[in-house]
From Swiss-Prot:
Membrane-traversing stretches: none
EC category: isomerase
InterPro entries: PsdUridine_synth_cat_dom_sf, PsdUridine_synth_N, tRNA_psdUridine_synth_TruB, TruB_C
Catalytic residues (UniProt): D39
Leader peptide range in chain numbering: none
Function description: Responsible for synthesis of pseudouridine from uracil-55 in the psi GC loop of transfer RNAs.
Lineage summary: Bacteria, Bacillati, Bacillota, Bacilli, Bacillales
Protein name per the record: tRNA pseudouridine synthase B
Entry EC no(s): 5.4.99.25
Length: 305
């Protein structure tokens, strides 16, 4: 039985569910879950939690992501990416903008921004996914969502050809960010229709491309009984949370029994959630949270016996 976090390289054409389904067959275990959907046409890092690590999948999802995308100015599509039908076209030429214009524009997207999710997305409105409305040619008001663009920058020269302009960007962002919507919004600010023509996720939850394995590589390692060495411990998925190392055996026992604590029993300031780590084994004991009605207390959220 495997336990840990496995960074998978999801190839284009597969859904995130496809990856989990195939892994369950390869590893012969049902206790597998991914840490956030990647669209079928997007390649890149998809951390997968296996065994007891499935309990920390939400925390891996919260740790942020990084992408490399190609923005195409001059044509917009129904899906905001290269898979959709053309909505609008407007010829773009090198006289319209240059590298400096794009760099200044990208700076304006840094920080907390508002996005309207694309119609072809899994965001739910009135209990129904937006892509279900889109497939039925129904329109529905899409709620604006705040997302965090931690960093964004151009990583290629502008390529003007066939009345369009293409350039690559690198984006570091929080969860829930739609890069294809970012591409179309860049176009709006330039005064042109636009779409995202290619996307690769280069980092997710602290895992990067060089750590990621294809399904074929995973199958080979499993058959050679050497896959466990490639898995990251579940503690890795909690590195986005503050932690306290526990030495006292009595305190360890209380934590593992799920007892409440007063905040002032610990030297560290506890603002929201805290991870307790066994000082001897370096293993996680539990995740605690501030009590919802008693601010001076913390209570267990997840205990790892």
């Amino acid at each position: 039985m495997y336990n840990g976090i496995l960074p998978v390289y999801k190839e284009r054409g597969l859904t995130s569910h496809d990856v989990v389904f195939k892994l369950r067959k390869i590893l012969k275990t049902k206790k597998i879950g991914h840490t956030g959907t990647l669209d079928p046409e997007v390649a890149g890092v998809l951390p997968v939690c296996i065994g007891n690590a499935t309990r920390v999948s939400d925390y891996v999802m919260d740790m942020g992501k990084a992408y490399e995308a190609t923005v195409s100015i001059g044509r917009s599509t129904t899906t905001e990416d290269q898979t959709g039908d053309t909505l609008e076209m407007k010829g773009v030429h090198s006289a319209n903008f240059n590298n400096d214009d794009i760099d200044r524009l990208l700076e304006s997207f840094k920080g907390i921004i508002e996005q309207i999710p694309p119609m072809y997305s899994s965001v739910k409105v009135n209990g129904k996914k937006l892509y279900e409305y889109a497939r039925n040619n129904e329109t529905v008001e899409r709620p604006k969502r705040k997302v965090n663009i931690k960093d964004i920058g151009r990583i290629s020269e502008l390529d003007f050809k066939e009345n369009e302009c293409h350039f690559k960007i690198r984006v570091i962002c929080g969860k829930g960010t739609y890069i294809r919507t970012l591409a179309t919004d860049i176009g709006v600010k330039l005064g042109f229709p636009a779409h995202m023509s290619k996307l690769t996720r280069i980092e997710s939850g602290g895992f990067v491309l060089k750590d990621s394995l294809t399904l074929e590589q995973i199958k080979e390692l499993h058959e050679q009984d050497s896959l466990q060495n490639k898995l990251f411990p579940l503690e890795y998925g909690l590195k986005g949370l503050p932690s306290i190392k526990i030495k006292d055996s009595h305190i360890k026992k209380r934590i593992l029994n799920g007892q409440k604590f007063n905040k002032n029993e610990f030297d560290n300031k506890i603002k929201d959630q805290i991870v307790f780590i066994d000082d001897d084994s370096e293993k996680v004991l539990a995740i605690y949270m501030v009590h919802p009605t008693k601010e001076s207390e913390i209570k267990p959220k997840k205990v790892f016996n």
